[in-house]
Amino acid sequence: MSRLLLFISLFFVSLPMFSQELRPDTVPSRPVKKSYVHLLHTDITRFDEAIDPEAWILVGNVSFRRDSMYMFCDSAHYYQKRNSFLAFGNVRMEQGDTLFLYGDYLDFDGVTNVARVRNNVRLIDKDIVLETDSLDYDRNRNLGYFFEYGVLYDSTGVLRSYYGDYNVDTRTAVFLDDVTLENSKFLLLSDTLYYNTDSKVATIVGPTNMYTGSTEVYSDRGTFNTATRHATLVERPVLYNDNRNVTADSIFYDTAKGYSEVFGNIVYTDTINRNMLTGEYAFLDEVRDSVYVTGRAMAVDFSQRDSLFVHSDTIWALTYNLDTDSLYRKVKSYNKVRAWGRNMQAVCDSLVFDSRDTCMTMYKDPILWNGDLQLLGEEVKVYMNDSTINWVNIINQALYVEELDSSIYNQIKGKEMEFYFTDGELREMHVIGSVEVVFYPLDSDSTYIGMNTTTSGRIIAYMKDRKVERVVVPKDSKGVFYPMSQRPEEKRFLDSFAWFDYVRPLSKWDIFNWRGKGGDKELKVIKKETVPLPTLDRFKK
């Protein structure tokens, strides 16, 4: 009798079921739950204790519903008591018209509301696709997490890693372990990355390298927008471009337009030319190969044993004729320029270095010091040779002062001066135009024998150990020699004499402390004739 009842029950439950939920009176009962897994359809339903004593075996066009989630497959094992099922073949889950989850196998736990999808898994949420071989989808949190390598595609790039998750509600992906984010314009490598598929913003939370064009970026914290290709980086990021790199407290980098704004404790280094720029704000233009620095701006040349430090309000490093054979660079320092090196110090209002003639030109009240020597004029040009001084040209109101002791100075003035150096040491000086000299010669025991005053149209002075060794003057020069005890007070100093030791930078840190000259010590204003520019009217006549 019991066998007959079993046969009859199996006969009826084996009939096809179409578009109806399995009623409670046709399946084993289960405790009432807040939310059920409902069987919507199956072609064949059977019970086979040998296969699974706790499950209904469903075959053909199987579909389930749990709340707003619909699930489809070729066949399934349905555990009504556990409110769960196993799905096999062409597994598909749908929620609304935007979320789809595909795979070859699904283990759905109705108690925890977690769907475990395996093999050829694809999660589609609007315009994004996540592919992996193993994904667990938590419907309580609308969170899918994978652990056997995953790839996320959206309209701006491809994101890969070994582990990660995707939140459907926030549309945010968290990728871990060997992360890559890339498209044809950039490549980002990290160990941890947060990515919002709506805003297209990747959040960097660990050591990360990014490559775009010829630039490499390193950062531990920041964001990168894959749509705009804007990066905002903090905690001392570094940008590398060929032989140059820059680091700072924070960097905004527009990789699309090729420029960056750099903020706080900036260090910009040229490793080939061995120089550096520092400051509090910088603008870097990769397209024009130019740099602008301000806020305690400083340029440092460390190409030689003794480094040279230059400070001004603003420093520009500009490149001209880029990508041509006539490429050259200019470095411009504006306002309150102060420079310090062990063998040379300088101040002026502005300074320009031109790589075409390796000339550094100082404008407006420039002063140079070399040991006990002080040089000044209206304009000073310093010509370099392999980062050492080759020769110096002082133009207009040129003045040379050499301190011998606290009250004795060798002094030379003229319209123009030329200084020639050998191995960085001053060897020869030419003074041209309205030359006046106050010179103290020495005897054999280095005692001053008197004071020599000379006027001439031109002189040549030869130097040794940064001091005047001898002076050559033309025969038509005029001069008077005074013994030391008979020096006239009014002849001891030239009328343009000035000793600016209080202005001189004392160290590389002192260049940030501006000290101007006294108002009575400014150079005389010389009126210069200007040639009128031709006009079109002149050519018409």
Predicted regions and their residues:
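Bacterial Sec-dependent N-terminal signal peptides
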Residues: 1-26, 541
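N-terminal amphipathic/hydrophobic interface segments
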Residues: 20-541
